[in-house]
């Protein structure tokens, strides 16, 4: 591969390198063919239930909308249907482009700080509002609306109450509890000036491999259908009440329409391959009570139905949702989801609006999308009637919510009432929700409830770990990278146990590794999945693998210590070895900020009442096990859950895994070797092999934290040479690119490069793109410290990489001498600063 020279990048190197903007190295990328529409993805609205409009048209509101639309320019109309992310837009942009909405994505926060204080959120809300209401000639002033993923409380803001994720709330089967959680969440959003949540998720999840399983209430429509109305009424208030959508209430969103939980293989943003009747009967029922409760926005799913993206399916968006169901609010897209429609890109997609989308979620693509959409409106390829209808729907919701007269967010009810954020009443509600969400799966010999006056060992990496306890969508998109100080109004499970035991005069010892000096009366081991969100949580199977905590449980059992396992997870998983090694086993899901609720249950302050919302698998490859299936054969059935009075013994279970342990799909290199399905290749460009000889380049094991957990790569300078991670089969990284994931390397430079160096991602013959590295590596060599390099995948895409068929996730190439040690390479949600690509 002949690599062109590129401009050097500026770099200030510390242990976490901050990268400046860089030039792109581009090699021609072929475009993947676009699939045509499928006849089986054409819904017949007459086959769907019909419903009357929730509200009769309000003549006063409709007249006002008529007046506004008549006074609006074409540019202002186009701006109203575009939503930009606060990480890529300024208040001045909102004013200049007449933008109708902003959002904060999972990794977007005021000032770019994941732990920005609540006051900064309120100040940002005021700034965006003020910009939208600033006089602009004769154009009408239209307030901006700010949307946020408040999916388990106001989870993006430090100090907010964090409720259990939906999977746990599904186990509670308590609609009144759900209503009260909606009310509390709405108030906490109002405190920070936000007026629109992208919740509730009404997914019916049919395959637990899906990375969003924990966002669904269950595997059947039953629970989501019973929860939709009370949760929406908790968030929005009740239709007819004076504070509907106002005062302590906000605007809710029913999502993701439709079939997001039914994709083939549980693949996030995948394809729901099924007949229309199955799509209708399994996945649409929760939307009807949501509409009856007056939900004002519906988010369109990333997924496809029989090969056609929902963002482009007119038969469902317009034919069913708007015409058959008489929905008069607006349809909002998901993160650049319109760009996945056949024939579209993130910056150009009139087809999605024609299909029925009313507001594009265009986080970083908004400016170019504005330009192309305006051109479509001027040319007539986006009919003005469709544009006006989308604008009418958005204005209708803003008028119903009283936003035109509401004043700046800090002046509205609850604005700036920071003492209520994570306040005692809301925390008590969250603790109640934890108590109701836990499911007792095993209780051999009636070990539970425990006596708090005993000598208790608390172990496992989840015991004192609020990051793990709260899961994804917590302060960051993936829920990772947080610290204890980021949770001022929270209690870890260990802290809850310690408080109970201390109050009862007992003794509690925390040791994640399970060490003790005096043999405990009982051990509580808390462990489970690390946080994830969306496709980052997709798995090839549902087997849980954790050699360290399994060994701990077995050692405690061998020592004759009764053991309680508390399992933290976003899905039902195969855990047979852990069940065998435990005397009692509690499915705690992702309980949120109130670890004391777990302690309450372990010590019998309340009896277990949670029932499984998902069937529990008996094998690691039993990924789609749903009640009602012809071959239904779970380990624990849908609706199972013990109480203290039940006989909780469990026969010894088979421990053989159905397949190899699931690999980390984002791991390119780590622990001294390439990730699963990948190879480290070396040699001259075009002549790579696993062992080319040391003439041009060599690789040897190196130590960082453990023996040979890294690799030393040494280029001799005798000629052009490449070190590359190569896929066994081309990888589709398009979802990861759209999701703002990054290629993150950790390396240490022992000898600065003597010639230009390029970091390249490849997608086949004459298809690659990348960036110059020489300046960065030269600076890193001066420090002799471990350096983190993070480059957003979208930068490689901009450089010409076809992200749907990546063959070489990264390669480092130079014709000069270079000596560096590579510790890890991953595709991740970045843990720190990333470079900004031009």
Where on the chain are the PLM-derived regions?
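Extracellular carbohydrate recognition and processing domains
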Residues: 766-803, 821
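Bacterial N-terminal signal peptides that target proteins for export
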Residues: 1-16
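C-terminal non-catalytic regions of proteins with extracellular/luminal or membrane-system context
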Residues: 31-55, 191, 370, 374-377, ...
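Short acidic, glycine/serine/threonine-rich loops at helix termini
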Residues: 155-160, 208-213, 262-269, 309-312, ...
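N-terminal beta-rich core of secreted/periplasmic extracellular enzymes
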Residues: 33-258, 282-366, 374-407, 432-447
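Bacterial N-terminal signal peptides
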Residues: 12-26
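Gly-rich Lys/Arg/Thr-decorated short loops/hinges at beta-loop-alpha junctions or inter-strand turns
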Residues: 161-165, 207-212, 261-271, 297, ...
């Amino acid at each position: 591969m002949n690599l062109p020279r590129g401009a050097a990048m500026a770099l200030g190197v510390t242990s976490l390198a901050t990268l400046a903007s860089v030039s792109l190295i581009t090699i021609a990328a072929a475009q993947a063919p676009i699939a045509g529409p499928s006849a089986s993805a054409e819904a017949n609205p007459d086959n769907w239930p019909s419903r009357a409009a929730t509200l009769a048209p309000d003549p006063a509101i409709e007249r006002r909308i008529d007046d506004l639309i008549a006074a609006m320019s074409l540019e202002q109309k186009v701006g109203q249907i575009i939503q930009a992310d606060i990480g890529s837009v300024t208040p001045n942009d909102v004013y200049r482009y007449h933008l109708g909405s902003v959002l904060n994505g999972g990794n977007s926060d005021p000032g770019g700080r994941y732990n920005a204080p609540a006051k900064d959120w309120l100040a940002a809300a005021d700034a965006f509002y003020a910009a939208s209401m600033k006089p602009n000639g004769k154009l009408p002033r239209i307030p901006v609306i700010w949307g946020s993923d408040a999916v388990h409380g106001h989870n993006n803001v430090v100090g907010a109450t964090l409720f259990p994720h939906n999977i746990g709330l599904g186990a509670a089967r308590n609609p009144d509890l759900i209503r009260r959680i909606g009310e509390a969440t709405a108030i906490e959003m109002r405190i920070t000036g936000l007026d629109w949540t992208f919740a509730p998720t009404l997914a019916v999840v049919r395959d637990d491999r899906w990375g969003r399983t924990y966002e669904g209430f269950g595997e059947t429509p039953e629970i989501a259908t019973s929860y939709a109305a009370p949760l929406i009424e908790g968030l929005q208030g009740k239709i007819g009440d004076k504070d509907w959508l106002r005062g302590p209430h906000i605007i809710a969103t029913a999502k993701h329409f439709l079939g997001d939980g039914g994709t083939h293989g549980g693949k996030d943003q995948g394809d729901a391959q099924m007949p229309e009747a199955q799509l209708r009967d399994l996945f649409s029922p929760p939307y009807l009570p949501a509409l009856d409760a007056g939900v004002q926005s519906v988010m369109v799913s990333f997924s496809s139905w029989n090969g056609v993206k929902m963002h482009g399916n007119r038969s469902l968006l317009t034919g069913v949702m708007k015409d058959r169901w008489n929905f008069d609010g607006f349809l909002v897209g998901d993160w650049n989801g319109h760009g996945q429609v056949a024939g579209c890109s993130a910056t150009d997609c009139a087809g999605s609006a024609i299909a029925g989308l009313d507001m594009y979620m265009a986080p970083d693509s908004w400016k170019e999308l504005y330009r192309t959409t305006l051109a479509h409106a001027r040319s007539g390829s986006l009919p003005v009637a469709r544009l006006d209808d989308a604008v009418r729907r958005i204005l209708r919701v803003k008028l119903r919510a009283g936003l035109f007269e509401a004043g700046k967010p800090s002046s509205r009810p609850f604005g700036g009432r920071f003492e209520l954020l994570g306040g005692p009443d809301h925390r008590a509600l969250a603790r109640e929700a934890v108590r109701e969400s836990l499911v007792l799966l095993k209780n051999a010999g009636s070990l539970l409830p425990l006596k708090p006056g005993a000598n208790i060992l608390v172990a496992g990496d989840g015991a004192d770990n609020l990051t793990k306890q709260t899961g994804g969508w917590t302060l960051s998109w993936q829920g990772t990278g947080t610290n204890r100080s980021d949770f001022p109004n929270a209690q870890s499970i260990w802290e809850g146990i310690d408080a109970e035991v201390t109050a009862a005069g007992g003794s509690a010892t925390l040791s994640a590794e399970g060490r003790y000096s005096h043999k405990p009366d009982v051990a509580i081991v808390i462990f489970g999945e690390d946080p994830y969100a969306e496709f980052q949580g997709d798995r090839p199977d549902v087997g849980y693998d954790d050699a360290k905590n399994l060994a701990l449980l077995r050692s405690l059992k061998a020592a004759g210590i009764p053991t309680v396992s508390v399992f933290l997870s976003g899905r039902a998983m195969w855990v047979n070895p852990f069940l065998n090694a435990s005397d009692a086993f509690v499915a705690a899901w992702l309980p949120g900020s109130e670890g004391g609720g777990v302690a309450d249950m372990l010590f019998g302050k309340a009896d277990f009442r949670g029932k499984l919302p998902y069937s529990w698998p008996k094998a690691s490859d039993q990924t789609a096990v749903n009640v009602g299936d012809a071959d239904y054969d779970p380990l624990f059935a849908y609706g199972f859950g013990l109480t203290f009075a039940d006989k909780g013994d469990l026969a010894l279970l088979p421990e053989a895994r159905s397949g190899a342990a699931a690999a980390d799909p984002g791991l390119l290199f780590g622990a001294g070797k390439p990730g699963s399905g990948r190879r480290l290749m070396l040699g001259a460009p075009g002549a790579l092999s696993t062992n080319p000889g040391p003439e041009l380049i060599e690789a040897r094991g190196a130590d960082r934290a453990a023996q040979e957990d890294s690799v030393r790569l040494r280029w001799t300078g005798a000629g052009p040479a490449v070190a590359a991670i190569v896929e066994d089969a081309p990888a589709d990284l398009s979802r990861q690119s759209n999701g703002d994931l990054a290629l993150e390397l950790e390396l240490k430079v022992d000898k600065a490069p003597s010639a230009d160096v390029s970091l390249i991602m490849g997608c086949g013959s004459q298809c690659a793109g990348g960036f110059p590295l020489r300046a960065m590596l030269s600076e890193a060599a001066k420090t002799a410290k471990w350096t983190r390099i993070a480059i957003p995948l979208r930068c490689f895409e901009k450089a010409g990489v076809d992200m749907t068929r990546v063959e070489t996730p990264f390669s480092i190439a130079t014709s000069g001498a270079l000596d560096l040690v590579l510790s890890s390479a991953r595709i991740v949600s970045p843990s720190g600063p990333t470079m900004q690509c031009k």
